[in-house]
Amino acid sequence: MQKSQNVTAVTETNGVAAALGGHHTSPDTNAGKTKDAKEFGCSLGDLRGLMEARGAEAIVRLSTEHEGVEGLCKKLKTDSLVGLNGEQADLDRRRHVYGANTIPPAKSKGFVRLVLDACKDPTLVILVLSGFINLALSFYEPTSAAEDATQHLVNATTAAILANGTFMSTTEAPSEGHGTAWIEGVAILLCVIVVVLVTAVNDYSKERQFRSLQEKIETGQKFSVIRNGEAIDVPVSDLVVGDIARVKYGDLLPADGFLIQSNDLKIDESSLTGESDHIKKSIESDPVLLSGTYAMEGSGKMLITAVGVNSQTGIIMTLLGAGKAGIGDDDSTSTSSSSSSSSSSSGSSSNGSSDSSKSGDDDLTAKSVLQAKLSKLALQIIYCGTTIAIIALIVLVTRFCLDHYVFEKNEFSLVDIQMFVKFFIIAVTILVISIPEGLPLAIALALTYSVRKMMHDNNLVRHLDACETMGNATSICSDKTGTLTTNRMTVVQSYINGNHYTSQEAQPHGANLPGSTGPILMEAISVNCAYNSMIVEPTKAGEQIQQLGNKTECGLLGFVNRLGGDYAAIRKKFPEHDLTKVYTFNSSRKCMMTVVPYAENGQNIGYRVYCKGASEIVLGRCTYLIGSDGKPHQLTGDRLKEITSTIIHEMANSGLRTICVAYKTIIKKGTRDVEKTEIEFAEDSDIDWDDEDAMYQNFTGIAICGIQDPVRPEVPVAISKCKKAGITVRMVTGDNIMTARAIAMSCKILEPGEDFLALEGKEFNERIRDENGKVSQAKLDEIWPRLRVLARAQPADKYTLVKGIIDSKATPQREIVAVTGDGTNDGPALKKADVGFAMGIAGTDVAKEASDIILTDDNFTSIVKAVMWGRNVYDSISKFLQFQLTVNVVAVITAFVGAVTVSDSPLKAVHMLWINLIMDTLASLALATEQPTDELLERKPYGRKKSLISRTMVKNILCHALYQLIIIFVIFFYGDTIFGIKTGLYAPLFAPPSQHFTLVFNAFVMMTVFNEINARKVHGERNVFKGLASNRVFCVIWVTTFIAQIIIVQFGGAWFSTAPLTLQQWIVCLVLGFSTLIWGQIVATIPSKKLPKAWKVGKGEVQPANLHINGDYNVRARSRAVTLRRSGKSLWVRGMFIIGNHLRVLRAFGMEKSEKAAFGRTAPAMTAEAAERWRASYRKYRHQKHQEKKATAETAESVKSADWAKEQKEKKKTFKQIKQVARGKSLDKDSKKHHKKRKDQTNVDMEDIELN
């Protein structure tokens, strides 16, 4: 009961008491709510108390206090069949009394808080300390002229070399005097303020963008409710107490409530309780449904009784917010803080062992390929900058000591301390220049810009790093239905009464079918389809029929209408709440069955079971088949083979999905004579509806339907683009192999003459598993490179394939895999994939929660667009790197050489401010906003191991840096002679700006600005102007930069340390700037392939767990490992879509604990006693369930032999030990011996345990 201990610990803290008790409602408000509650007959407190009960206690309280669910419906003024009337006044009144279905979000960081966060940067702290020391020492006046001259020289050196791109003095330079030495220290502090403000503004803007994205995700969540007798989808936030909600397979329950109707409904409550088994819900045994849990099987209806902060999700969020714990840490402080926000929670609910915690951290620190390589590159740059800074410091200190103490034989004085501080500032400044501080901004801009644009291309990105990871994808495992096809199902062929109707126009009319075939077929389809599947006839000419719900079932319902029937009228005869039993479709059974009462002459005489599903599977369960005379005939093995080969295979080869419809009748003994196809029973208690195997046999086949799902016309072109881009597309589908192969041929996944594999799931498993049934990576490596189609695939097969491709080292470049999924069971595969795509239309909440990107149109072409945007992000960051590193190299070398040669720098501090502004902010905006082009799909993926900076980029960086350095040093050392102007070398500290140094500055900026155009191409392209006109942002920034440079040079004066230049000098600078374009063409002629392979940076596969770059763009540390069974290990909120999103936002925005404490304070108080009652009731319920299982086991043991019982006990113990190992728990000595003994006897696949 680790989870209970955690809740107790949180509840008992002072923080919880303060937060939960800090909310007080005014007497007037309470009085108003009490008055409204009397109108409904049930107060908020009554419902909250009722929801604390579990199992039998909940049933008893519901029955005694409210006369059952129907009585509670009456008190809440709702109807279990019709629902609420939907009037806005009624909905508002319910929200006023019982609350809205929203959880108050955490207050976003204010600008002042962001400023304080920016001040925590270690580099800025060092500079602030240096500034204060410098400022304090500046007021000391040296006593000797020699010391005064020395101090002036040092001041000149440091003022010139201060190269943090943000150092600027706002005071006009004085002409002389030691009394102004304080300006340098003040300038340092002022420029730190500028840095902090720029950082805070950037973070504030970025936070607003992330909030906008988060709202987009959350507002897209809808749920089906019944209002005014009609089923409608409403936003989750619009749900109110009293709503009748329809629960279906894959739904995330958005509120608490009681079950009204259950069709084999099973719920995954592991996110709340840690219980790994799916809980079967029924009105008789366990009717309580809790928010934050998932419907894993079946369907049903529920009465909503608690929403928002009063639901289980809201209560937990209130506790988490008040407890100041478990949500996450500020990910701007360290790598571990950004990655352990989730793992710390899971660790607290596990054994607490270090091994387990470490494993969780390792999973959560996984970054994308690009982020990992950028982190490694940043470290390499910092190492180089640190080395240069240390060398500069050693040279300056050594030279000063030799000159001052050895040669001049001076004594040590306070001035010397000031000089050493100056030298230290110079070294720190060189280090600051080398740090790629603009890199996180460029990444954030590229990602957020791309994410906004991708929304227009039907890609809703949930995790920002997924969009650039997609650019590296080498393999796509795609579903068929709805992704490659239109998902508009139509029955175009059928096999009825021994006749094969081969076209849609040739389909028969129901009245013309012999015997009772027509009515039985239409009833079998209408009743045995989910009642939320329906077709809406067009209201205007030219419109198509609208299909709602499951598209396969909609195709069958359309077939009923074409037969002359009315599926809606048939359903009225069999209301959903009167259905005896529903066995919903699942991937293992491959069929759906519905049991309805069967009557003759107005008298119920038994039951009829309708079945539909995969044709070869359902037909194999049939013992009879309706023939041409309308009567059932024995279905022999030979007849079954004939139908399979001539009908099913022929339809499948035409790309049709084949569905078999069957039925059987169960007649009560004594009502009438039983026919040969019917089954007799004595009493209702004799029928075990839970025995699916008994139900799933002895059917009579009615018809086989061939359903056409046309391939999307744009898909073949998109797949051809993927092939050209070096991306392998694989189709994973549940259809049979022939249908799958035919669709693959239509999509050009398979083409004539290619030696690729198309396998069924069964054969796939036989080929990849060893003699013990375990997946062999070696065998899998022999299969997956040639595999293109996987048919009749189970979700576990998809997971095995994805995991095998990702883990494989069979190819030189490790594969990066994208996966599409829509079902609940696709969750593990979506999580395991590098990028998971969920279907926005057909996808379940489970699939969407597990995904990285949601396809809002379920279209494969949107995936191709995601690839383009991903590669565009990669290219945008590469362009910025190429540009920034060139400027970095030139600036660092210039500052270093100036410091160690003439104790002066050609670039002043204010010049470096402007250059860094160009290099960081403006270049980020200009280069990170390029539009993607189809040319991006003409290159192969980068892969996991390819260098971040290619030989071409290294060539460009070094060649352009060398060219610029030569020009700068020529002007620096010989410019006065060349231009006939006064030299700026060895000028006094407070001398007015010189044309000499202004020429150096202007030439450098002109070359930098023109080189920004060169930086637009990173793959050796000749035409650097291609696409320039379409990038308005780049053009505006470039022109603005150019004009600003003219103003700074001509009118900046002492403020910008510039002197106006003549027209001739401007022409020279412009020529030098333009010459970089010509030089770029010369550099492009150097073949990159002939350069040394060592000219690569960031090559090899990166292990990013311990790498970090400022955390700005690491929005969420995503776990890529498959989720193990979560019994006792997972925090309650794991698996909750809404809560999970909110926690990710908290981590993305770097919320501090104090802010998290405020989260949830607006929620109504939940007392510690109430929380303890909740836990106690659940413990009591689980104990009751344990006793029931124990009693069942004892009964079984009394019937079975002692050997069988012993075998079962050993198996259970083995499974328990394996789960302990999976959770990181240790075994005692006896358990270890038993585990080793049973290891070879029991074939247990760990992957199956993870999935099942």
From Swiss-Prot:
Its main location: membrane. The lineage of its organism: Eukaryota, Metazoa, Ecdysozoa, Nematoda, Chromadorea. Catalyzes the hydrolysis of ATP coupled with the transport of calcium across a membrane. Residues 1-121, 202-376, 444-879, 930-960, 1011-1035, 1087-1252 are cytoplasmic. Belongs to the cation transport ATPase (P-type) (TC 3.A.3) family. Type IIB subfamily. Ca(2+) 2 binds at residues 888, 920. GO terms for molecular function: ATP binding; ATP hydrolysis activity; calmodulin binding; metal ion binding; P-type calcium transporter activity. Interacts with calmodulin. Residues 333-357 have a biased composition (Low complexity). It comes from Caenorhabditis elegans. The chain crosses the membrane at residues 122-142, 181-201, 377-397, 423-443, 880-900, 909-929, 961-981, 990-1010, 1036-1056, 1066-1086. It is a multi-pass membrane protein. Residues 1124-1142 are annotated as: Calmodulin-binding subdomain A. Residues 330-361, 1181-1252 are annotated as: Disordered. The active site is at residue 479. This is Plasma membrane calcium-transporting ATPase mca-1. Glycans are attached at residues 155, 164.
